[in-house]
Amino acid sequence: GSNLEHHALAASTALQANQVVATPMGNPTHYGDPKDGCRPDEAQTTIQGVAGDLCTPRCSLFTPCPTDTPPGVAAQPQCALEDARSLQKFCALLCSTSLPILDQRAADAQCGEKASCKAVQAGIGLCTYDD
């Protein structure tokens, strides 16, 4: 059966997210669409109050974020999410360094074709997949 784990993730402030450990197959790069299956070292993550989901690799002070992004993605991987309970950090794709997102179309374009840039409480924009 599937092994479901739920975590509350935070993007530096009290940003909550649920995370499901996904099937190890699918996407050729990190930060792919969870619909296609996250990689074995990623978690499928939703951020509370933010539409969509994303595959998030773990990161820490000593483990930088992987830089292999899906084709067409210009957003920068950042160690921006944190599980409030375990304090484990996760990488996400940063598409706006400030809020409000001034040019939504340009911000969305950084996320590739199936994802868009969403404002999160930490004062940044992160890419999530809408499908």
Which residue ranges define each predicted feature?
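Secreted, cysteine-rich disulfide-bonded mini-domains of extracellular proteins
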Residues: 3-131
